[in-house]
């Protein structure tokens, strides 16, 4: 640190060291010139966040100061020795509530709402999606969390024209192994989306490491009192309509 600054570390429960002494996460600390702050790899969880009062003063690109590695937009990616300028300190000091990140328990249970192509899986495929514990693959990143397990059986073998994708969409490619799309998801995708993970659970999924377990729990739609699998059948488009057709 080259000048006085307030900072905080949040996200995964990492160990914070200030000049070699252990400090806590999720609270503001005042750093003086010459202080050294270290964030140690957390025992659970994947991502920790360092915030400084005044923000990081780098040029804004399309309204953001983050780096998008896929599109090569934003500031130069961080490297050892990179100096980050801090912006002006805003006034007054904000008063906000404290929301701690809960510990990551594995297997992590997340809710799953029926997707527009849920009925492209067989009944056994729908059950298997929620009955087994999936393992997070090493191929996971901010684009999506790839899961390993027993492949899901698809009822419809045809492929789709590209359809819109959102964060949390659960897509099943020809391998039968699902993918949960993350914040760097593409705009469209050509494989059936059989379910959608709600936004609050997406934040929990983002803390999973390769090798961690995950289990889905079907959630019935608010408009029906049916059991989850019945809700899935009624929500998905009929496969008899064929890809690209609109539901009646």
PLM regions and their residue ranges:
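Conserved "landmark" site that anchors the functional core of diverse proteins
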Residues: 1-248
